[in-house]
A protein has these predicted regions:
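N-terminal glycine-/serine-/threonine-rich phosphate-binding loop
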Residues: 1-54, 350-351, 358
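Ligand-binding beta-strand-loop-alpha-helix segment within the catalytic cores
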Residues: 7-21, 79-153, 279
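A conserved mid-domain beta-alpha-beta active-site/ligand-binding segment of alpha/beta enzyme cores
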Residues: 558-614
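Class I SAM-dependent methyltransferase SAM-binding "motif I" and its flanking Rossmann-like core
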Residues: 161, 165-209
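Active-site beta-strand->loop->alpha-helix modules in alpha/beta enzyme cores, enriched
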Residues: 294-371, 375-546, 580-585, 599-604, ...
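ATP/nucleoside-binding phosphotransfer catalytic cores, i.e., glycine-rich phosphate-binding loops
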Residues: 2, 210, 216-311
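Short Gly/Thr/Asp-enriched flexible loops that form oxyanion-binding sites at enzyme active sites
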Residues: 66-72, 163-176, 522-538
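Glycine-rich N-terminal segment of FAD-binding domains in flavoprotein oxidoreductases
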Residues: 47-78
Length: 637
């Protein structure tokens, strides 16, 4: 299929889509996919034969790339919006238009303020109405859509409850614009935007399922690992009002545009051998044998020819060899990932080890997007590297200041006040900052953020001291892109790249460790990783980079699949406790976490259970039984 063509195609027409009920296309690059969607919208606007081209618009992080490209098309390619009318899907009830969390604010920030769309052609549900006014208003919203001939192109996102718009589980297929009570999961997902669940509205005004299905063309965006399960259910399972997005199966011109992580749970990607004939790459063979071991509930070396045949893997045996040979090969592949020497074991044959033996003492640079990602993700490995004599450096890429609660900041200010009783200038300054915290709802003032950043920095130093890591080998980069004081960050600038490149140039590491978990709900990990990738691409011409290997870890948000793991560092029970204690030095992140995501467990609990699960998976596959395992994947540049 031409990936540049988003034209609707009936699902199920070929073997690869036979389990699917909604047309979908997967892209490796979100920016590329967003640009193609924006181009389809632009073509619709330019080719519109009626007076107006009517757009249905969504909010949230998913469509931001599309809006960014539409702005570019307007400014650089003269795309005009004078013949466009827009209708937004929804709005929180009880928010004023000017509220920073309103969808009015969102749309003006990301699109409307940057294009020539007349203000009287913009329609967004009004969340500031009284409850008595809502019913009549919703009917008028529907009538207004109909008066323009209906929606030509509807852009959608999808929530964890499979809601589209704010159509929560239980919504009727024929529902129209109305007020709805928000599902607890939906409110939980919005909690970080509102600085706490208590401040999230309980109701919203939303276009109905029927309103959405009346659109002539629908495109739904799905980005990221956290959307994979609900997207697979929506695309492959039966229609049910328990999962409202499944109603889109009834639409004659609906396409889902996904990235690789969001489409990972679709049968054609998760178990392609059950869908069609496979091109058996090494990674796919690993994936299939791990899956078979789980299905058959047997360790790898006990899998039989019958197991392969009964679970749809006869083609693997036919093309790759006898089960006995496959089992031995896979067992060795896994065994060779395990090492207690993450920096390489000196004076040994390293042919079957994940890391080189030379040089025996390496310079190691660990990049940590937030100030605690290093110990959460690889605290046990850091301890091993230090104990085995390597020169370990940790670079904290961002200050993490917005993740410190006001209460935590006040506590440190009060400690400081009690330490400077005779210094009136300092006391006056601290009193002023305390007043700022008490009076300002969002606390984005530079002085407040500076103190919160200092809290995070002191915690890093304490954790490093516990691991016997010299403070001089801790590098606080404070990358400027992060310093907005808000969840939404700036795009990386030349300064961000320069700071990162200068540090790598200075240390000239033999190993770099970086966060490869792109499921971080606020995108900081992805931005930090992209900065590193860009810098590595620029630096690879330098001689010292020939001796540098890059390893990606995953932290509190996501784990590596077994078939992707290339280095597995086992932890003993004592090392698990050592790692836990290192994490607990980050006290500001222990109890009241500002941006916890959708997992309510504390970070140290998540990390511990994730490492234990990886060890259990290895053991189930026939490897030795360990208390925990930290896993890494090599990045080739």
């Amino acid at each position: 299929m031409n990936q540049n063509n988003l034209t609707f195609q009936l699902p199920g027409r070929n073997e690869s889509t036979r389990f699917e009920k909604i047309h979908n296309i997967t892209y490796d690059n979100v920016a590329e996919a967003s640009a193609l969607i924006a181009q389809e919208i632009a073509n619709g606007i330019r080719n519109c034969k009626s007076e107006f081209y009517v757009l249905g618009l969504a909010t949230g992080s998913s469509p931001i790339g599309v809006y960014k490209e539409l702005v570019r098309l307007h400014k650089e390619e003269n795309l005009t919006f004078k013949n466009v009318v827009t209708f937004n899907l929804d709005e929180y009830f009880g928010l004023k238009i000017e509220d920073k969390n309103s969808y009015h604010s969102f749309m003006h920030t990301h699109l409307f303020d940057h294009i020539n769309l007349p203000k009287d052609q913009i329609y967004i549900p009004d969340g500031s109405l009284s409850e008595k006014e809502v019913s009549a208003y919703c009917l008028s919203y529907e009538e207004k859509i109909e008066s323009f001939g209906g929606i030509d192109f509807q852009l959608l996102g999808i929530g964890r409850t499979a809601h589209i718009g704010f159509n929560e589980p239980g919504s009727h297929i024929n529902s129209i614009t109305r007020m709805i009570a928000l599902d607890p999961i939906t409110r939980e997902d919005a909690a970080s935007d509102f600085n706490g669940l208590n401040f999230v509205p309980t109701k919203a005004i939303t276009m109905g399922i029927g309103s959405i299905l009346n659109a002539k063309r629908i495109v739904l965006l799905g980005w990221g690992h956290k959307k994979a399960a609900v997207l697979a259910l929506t695309i492959e399972k039966e229609i049910t009002n328990t999962y409202p997005a499944t109603f889109l199966q009834n639409h004659p011109n609906c396409t889902f545009i996904l990235d690789a992580e969001a489409s990972a749970e679709l049968s054609k990607h998760k178990t392609p051998w059950l869908v069609k004939e496979c091109d058996w790459t090494e990674r796919l063979i690993k994936k299939a044998i791990v899956w078979l071991s789980n299905q058959a509930q047997k360790p790898i070396l006990k899998l039989t020819n019958r197991d392969y045949n009964e679970h749809g893997l006869s083609s693997l045996v036919a093309s790759q060899g006898l089960p006995y040979e496959l089992n031995i090969w896979m067992f060795n592949q896994l065994q060779h990932t395990i090492t207690g020497w993450p920096g390489g074991k000196p004076n040994t044959d390293d042919k079957n080890r994940p890391e080189r033996s030379d040089p025996a003492k390496k310079r190691v640079l660990i990049f940590s997007p937030h100030p605690d990602d290093d110990v959460i993700s690889m605290g046990g490995t850091i301890a091993r590297l230090i104990e085995q004599g390597h020169e370990v450096h940790v670079a904290y890429q961002t200050s993490g200041n917005i993740t410190v609660s006001d209460e935590e900041a006040l506590k440190f200010i009060e400690v400081a006040e009690n330490s400077f009783l005779k210094d009136k200038t300092t006391l006056d300054h601290l009193q002023s900052v305390k007043q700022d915290i008490n009076l300002n709802e969002n606390n984005l003032l530079k002085e407040v953020l500076s103190i919160k950043g200092a809290v995070r920095k002191s915690e890093c130093i304490a954790a490093g001291r516990f691991l016997k890591l010299p403070t001089k080998q801790l590098h606080f980069l404070n990358l400027p892109f992060y310093e907005t004081g808000k969840i939404i960050k700036n795009e990386p600038s030349a300064t961000d790249y320069k700071i990162t490149q200068e540090l790598i140039d200075k240390i000239q590491p033999h190993q770099i460790f970086a966060a490869g978990d792109l499921a971080d709900p606020h995108g900081t990990h992805k931005t930090c990783l992209n900065i590193i990738f860009k810098v590595l691409d620029d630096l690879k011409v330098k001689k010292y980079m020939d001796a540098c290997r890059v390893w990606l870890y995953r932290s509190a948000w996501q784990a590596w699949d077994i078939e992707d793991i290339e280095m597995a560092v086992p932890l003993s029970p004592d090392q698990v406790i050592q790692k836990r204690n290192a994490i607990l030095f980050h006290q500001s992140q222990k109890d009241k976490v500002m941006f916890q995501g959708k997992d309510n467990r504390e970070f140290w609990v998540r990390a511990e259970q994730r490492n234990q699960t990886t060890a259990e998976l290895y053991n189930h596959l026939g490897m030795a039984e360990y208390a925990a395992i930290e896993a890494f994947k090599q990045y080739l540049f």
